[in-house]
A protein has these predicted regions:
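Secondary-structure end/capping motifs
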Residues: 75, 80-154
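Residue-level preference for alpha-helix termini and adjacent loops
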Residues: 49, 67, 79-80, 127, ...
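Pocket-lining segment of extracytoplasmic ligand-binding domains
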Residues: 4-107
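Alpha-helix boundary/capping detector
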Residues: 49, 117, 121, 177-179
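Intrinsic disorder and flexible coil segments
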Residues: 16, 28-33, 94, 127-136, ...
Length: 183
């Protein structure tokens, strides 16, 4: 259970409201979201990005910190791993194989209906490398996770400064950047 620092106020989201609507209504000041939220899609003038040229800001941040935010983390209860130690690495390989199939498809410029898709794809690879959302605990993800864990500790969200070795099983070494997509 999280025990927040005394100066941090946590309020539960009402069941009858979305955080997107609350932002548009001015009930919350800011929102971090992985999707483009409905008020932005609708062109609601009450909602705007923090940085108008967000792409340039994200690129600047990446070049400065080498952090590209992790989208998801997979967790398996320790009791499951203890009983079935083959599960983590086999799940990892299954997800890697699935991703490899998808990424191979992305190399085809006709996979998405965008006129300049290939140019955007190549630009992303030039800046972020071949796989910005790599799986496993390679050097990039360890750097990301250790940095985030450090921020959590500095901001009083955790009492201990955790590392990836504390939080994750050692079976996930991951694919190295630049490796070919394998199927």
């Amino acid at each position: 259970m999280l025990t927040p620092p005394p100066d941090l106020k946590i309020t539960r989201l009402p069941h009858n409201k979305s955080v997107e609507d609350m932002l548009a209504e001015g009930e919350v000041d800011a929102l971090i979201h992985s999707d483009i939220i409905k008020p932005m899609e609708a062109g609601d003038p009450r909602v705007a990005r923090l940085w108008p040229d967000y792409k340039a800001e994200e690129i600047r941040f990446y070049k400065k910190t080498q952090i590209f935010p992790i989208m998801h983390v997979m967790g398996i209860r320790q009791e499951i791993v203890d009983r079935h130690p083959w599960i983590p690495i086999n799940l990892f390989h299954a997800f890697e194989k699935s991703k490899a199939i998808g990424m191979r498809r992305m190399e085809n410029p006709r996979i998405v209906p965008l006129a300049w898709y290939l140019e955007a794809w190549n630009e992303q690879q030039e800046i972020l490398g071949p796989d910005p959302w790599e799986y496993g605990l390679g050097d990039k993800n360890k750097h990301n996770m250790n940095t985030i864990a450090g921020y959590s500790h500095e901001q009083g969200l955790t009492k201990h400064r955790w590392t990836t070795d504390d939080l994750f099983t050692s079976t996930f070494q991951g694919r190295k950047r630049g490796d070919e997509w394998r199927i």
